[in-house]
């Protein structure tokens, strides 16, 4: 029985000619003229009609075109899926819920751009920052300039100061988490102030007085572009940096020396974040061991996220799941754990490799200070990870985790961006995640939506930039000893976890500053309200 024809008569004729055109040079090279003659007769194609009417290399071009179209179809299907996810998430959040989000200060979210601070045409904004105590914003530009605006000036759109900080682009601007005494006379000395640091593609880190913006000293030692810097969470005079030379360096700002270098990645290290059990934003404040110091999380072009112990440089775990370069990574604050722990416990079947003992491990609280992190990369995704606890031995630094082959557990994918995710930031309440992307948008994700259906929803989509969004920042606030949640009430009764969390949120709400900025390649820093 003959199979029905898929091609028309004309298409069949073109295919037959293309087959002979493809086979002919192969047969001639093999001195097999009879093959071509028989093929011509079988396909009813005169040999003289091929060269005139058939495009050269017709069969190969058809084949490669089909492959390209298949790849394009796959890409378009993925894009449609992402758009459906965004639309669904926006439709699922009811208006009543939206009003609750913006109702109180602790849940304040930006919604529209109210000011645009312009730079010159050759000054693409690569990094942004907000002064930790004053209404001052800063932008680091591609020409090495550091531009400073004061938000309370009458002419706030005019820069208060422009500093030629570096000879190449300013990649990161970082502030000390507490005032720093660089004189070495002790942190209790009067007159000390916050310190600012900038890093650049010119292979240098520069330290600046946070009050006067005068240059204090320059740190050198990296052999390639310095991607990111962050101040220690437990020692104000310590700075960490990562570079394209694959290394992580630890700097003592009092004397300007590099006191430690370690390499944990096989390619360009893009970003770094730090956390410590000494943080005053923990829900538990008893029985902590400050001796372990800081823990670092770094991400790289090698598509991995590495958790390290800062003092020893020991790698404790790797988180692998991104399919392209990872641009940014952040620890989640400890008060985010309540939201994510609840989701995992309510959906145990989705995480068969995560035992209840891991989720309830007291070492996260008493010794480590970290539990979850998020990452964003060039695969257009933001990923949420549970980091495994390390192994502890008496009188030794922490050792690599023995759980899950020393790898982090992927908890959720935040899907919605159409291009590279370049920057991440965490809302002070620990509930919302901000992501800036090359698709010109900033998305706000609600981690509490994990408790609904296991998918993190995008609750807001900030549109205003006309080019790639390179950096975003939510204003920090001073962390003091009274920002914590104790275990017991005044009457001696033990507080519930919910009570401690509510107390912590009230403490944060009293300090929070509702300022959010972003910077991009459209020569603009935007202030959102």
Swiss-Prot record:
Keyword Nuclease belongs to the record: no
Major location category of this protein: cytoplasm
GO terms of biological process kind: cell division; establishment of mitotic spindle orientation; microtubule sliding
Subcellular location: Cytoplasm, Cytoskeleton; Cytoplasm, Cytoskeleton, Spindle pole
Domain of life: Eukaryota
InterPro entries per UniProt: Dynein_regulator_LIS1, G-protein_beta_WD-40_rep, LIS1_N, WD40/YVTN_repeat-like_dom_sf, WD40_repeat_CS, WD40_repeat_dom_sf, WD40_rpt
Keyword check for Magnesium: no
Start and stop residues of the WD repeats: 120-159, 165-218, 221-261, 264-318, 321-395, 416-455, 496-529
Coiled coil start-end: 68-89
SMART domains for this protein: WD40 (SM00320)
One function term, GO molecular function aspect: dynein complex binding
Keywords assigned by UniProt, alphabetized: Cell cycle, Cell division, Coiled coil, Cytoplasm, Cytoskeleton, Microtubule, Mitosis, Repeat, Transport, WD repeat
GO CC list: cytoplasm; microtubule; microtubule associated complex; spindle pole; transferase complex
Function: Positively regulates the activity of the minus-end directed microtubule motor protein dynein. Plays a central role in positioning the mitotic spindle at the bud neck during cell division. Targets cytoplasmic dynein to microtubule plus ends, thereby promoting dynein-mediated microtubule sliding along the bud cortex and consequently the movement of the mitotic spindle to the bud neck.
Oligomeric and partner information: Self-associates. Interacts with NDL1 and dynein.
Stated family: Belongs to the WD repeat LIS1/nudF family.
Protein name (Swiss-Prot/TrEMBL): Nuclear distribution protein PAC1
Natural source organism: Debaryomyces hansenii (strain ATCC 36239 / CBS 767 / BCRC 21394 / JCM 1990 / NBRC 0083 / IGC 2968)
Gene: PAC1
């Amino acid at each position: 029985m003959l199979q029905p024809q898929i091609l028309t008569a004309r298409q069949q004729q073109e295919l037959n000619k293309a087959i002979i055109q493809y086979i002919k040079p192969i047969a001639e090279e093999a001195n097999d003229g009879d093959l071509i003659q028989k093929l011509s007769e079988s396909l009813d194609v005169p040999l003289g009609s091929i060269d005139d009417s058939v495009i050269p290399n017709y069969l190969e071009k058809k084949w490669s075109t089909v492959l390209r179209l298949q790849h394009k179809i796959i890409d378009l299907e993925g894009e449609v899926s992402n758009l459906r996810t965004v639309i669904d998430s926006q439709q699922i959040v009811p208006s009543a819920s939206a009003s609750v989000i913006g109702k109180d200060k602790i849940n304040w979210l930006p919604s529209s751009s109210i000011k645009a601070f312009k730079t010159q045409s050759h000054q693409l904004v690569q990094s942004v920052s907000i002064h930790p105590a004053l209404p001052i914003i800063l932008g680091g530009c591609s020409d090495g300039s550091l531009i400073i605006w004061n938000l309370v000036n009458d002419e706030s759109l005019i820069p208060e100061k422009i500093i030629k900080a570096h000879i190449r682009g300013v990649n990161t601007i970082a502030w000390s988490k507490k005032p720093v005494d660089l004189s070495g006379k002790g942190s209790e000395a009067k007159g000390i102030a916050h310190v600012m640091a900038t890093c650049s593609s010119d292979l240098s880190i520069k330290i600046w007085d946070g009050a006067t913006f005068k240059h204090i000293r320059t740190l050198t030692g990296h052999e390639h572009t310095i991607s990111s810097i962050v101040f220690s969470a437990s020692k104000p005079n310590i700075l960490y940096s990562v570079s394209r030379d694959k290394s992580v360096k630890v700097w003592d700002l009092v004397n300007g020396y590099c006191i430690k270098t370690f390499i944990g990645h096989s390619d360009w290290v893009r970003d770094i974040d730090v956390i410590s059990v000494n943080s005053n934003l923990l829900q538990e404040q008893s029985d902590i061991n400050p001796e372990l110091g800081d823990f670092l999380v770094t991400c790289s072009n090698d598509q991995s996220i590495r958790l390290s112990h800062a003092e020893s440089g020991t790698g404790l775990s790797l988180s692998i799941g991104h399919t392209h370069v990872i641009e940014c990574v952040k620890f989640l604050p400890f008060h985010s754990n309540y939201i994510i722990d609840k989701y995992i416990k309510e959906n145990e079947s989705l995480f068969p490799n995560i035992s209840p003992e891991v989720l309830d491990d007291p070492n996260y609280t008493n010794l480590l200070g970290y539990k979850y992190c998020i990452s964003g990369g060039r695969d257009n995704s933001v990923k949420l990870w549970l980091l495994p606890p390390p192994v502890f031995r008496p009188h030794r630094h922490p050792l690599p985790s023995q759980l899950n082959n020393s790898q982090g557990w992927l908890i959720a994918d935040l899907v919605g961006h159409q291009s590279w995710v370049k920057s991440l930031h965490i809302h002070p309440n620990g509930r919302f995640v901000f992501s800036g992307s090359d698709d010109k948008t900033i998305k706000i994700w609600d981690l509490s939506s994990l408790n609904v259906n296991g998918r993190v929803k995008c609750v807001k989509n900030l549109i205003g930039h006309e080019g790639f969004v390179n950096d975003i920042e939510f204003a920090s606030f001073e962390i003091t000893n009274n920002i914590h949640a104790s275990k017991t009430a005044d009457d001696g009764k033990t507080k519930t976890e919910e009570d401690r969390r509510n107390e912590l949120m009230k403490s944060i709400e009293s300090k929070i500053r509702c300022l959010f900025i972003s910077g991009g390649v459209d020569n603009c820093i935007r202030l959102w309200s």
